[in-house]
Amino acid sequence: MIRSVLASVSPLRQILASQLCTSSITLAGIRPLGPKNKAPDFSGTAVVNGDFKTISMKDYKGKWLILFFYPLDFTFVCPTEITAFSDRCAEFQKLNTELIACSCDSHFSHLAWIQTPRSEVGGLGDMKIPVLADFNKDIANAFGVLDHETGISYRGLFLIDPSGEIRHSLVNDLSVGRSVDEAFRTLKAFQFVEKHGEVCPANWSDDKPTIKPGIKESKEYFKKVDGHT
């Protein structure tokens, strides 16, 4: 079964490789959802702990959620991203945050990819996060990351808060993967703001000072970091 699934996705791999070489795909017309948008109420079949399971946005009520899209199974950059997020899943869960990977492949393709060892040229191996199938492309379309010419999604990432509101989004073109470190830093920054009411400056990390959002109050930060008297 796995071999037949792998054979069926080979043409898709060739399409993606061709697009990466010719740069024929652009972000023209792509309008991803951004801050203050409510996350669409998606539902679909995912591979969870080696089994098929229906998951939905409603399952994550009261939690932070990072939903990230990738173009295709059995490709090149995609497994590096998915395994990197999966391997650090426990760190995100300690912050009441779940992760979902999603593409426009079928759940059978996802399962075949997960059952392929990492040592075999880009297999996923053991997954600690759900890999969601969006075979009808409704989810990618709803989040605004679907390329309608090719039927695949761009590398969109959405940070959704416990109320279901999108707080952060980014979209990469196909050839560049995303940073797990930056996703984790951004999550911690938004959670810090929610808890403390102060705002986070450029390149903030949790061992650095934040800014009190007021004309007079903010001077404390700038004196500290710029050495003003």
Curated annotation (Swiss-Prot):
Entry keyword set: Antioxidant, Disulfide bond, Oxidoreductase, Peroxidase, Redox-active center
Stored InterPro entries: AhpC/TSA (IPR000866), Peroxiredoxin (IPR050217), Peroxiredoxin_AhpC-typ (IPR024706), Peroxiredoxin_C (IPR019479), Thioredoxin-like_sf (IPR036249), Thioredoxin_domain (IPR013766)
Annotated SUPFAM superfamilies: Thioredoxin-like
Gene3D superfamilies reported for this sequence: Glutaredoxin (3.40.30.10)
Main EC class the enzyme belongs to: oxidoreductase
Membrane-crossing residue ranges in chain numbering: none
Catalytic activity field: a hydroperoxide + [thioredoxin]-dithiol = an alcohol + [thioredoxin]-disulfide + H2O
A GO cellular component entry from the record: cytosol
Catalytic activity, EC: 1.11.1.24
Active-site residues annotated for this sequence: C78 (cysteine sulfenic acid (-soh) intermediate)
Pfam families for this protein: 1-cysPrx_C, AhpC-TSA
Biological process per Gene Ontology, one example term: cellular response to stress
Signal sequence region: none
Sequence ranges assigned to domain Thioredoxin in this UniProt record: 33-192
GO molecular function, a single term: thioredoxin peroxidase activity
Additional notes on this entry: The active site is a conserved redox-active cysteine residue, the peroxidatic cysteine (C(P)), which makes the nucleophilic attack on the peroxide substrate. The peroxide oxidizes the C(P)-SH to cysteine sulfenic acid (C(P)-SOH), which then reacts with another cysteine residue, the resolving cysteine (C(R)), to form a disulfide bridge. The disulfide is subsequently reduced by an appropriate electron donor to complete the catalytic cycle. In this typical 2-Cys peroxiredoxin, C(R) is provided by the other dimeric subunit to form an intersubunit disulfide.
Family note: Belongs to the peroxiredoxin family. AhpC/Prx1 subfamily.
Subunit structure: Homodimer; disulfide-linked, upon oxidation.
The protein's role, per its UniProt record: Thiol-specific peroxidase that catalyzes the reduction of hydrogen peroxide and organic hydroperoxides to water and alcohols, respectively. Plays a role in cell protection against oxidative stress by detoxifying peroxides and as sensor of hydrogen peroxide-mediated signaling events.
Name of the protein in question: Peroxiredoxin 1
Naturally occurring in which organism (per UniProt): Brugia malayi (Filarial nematode worm)
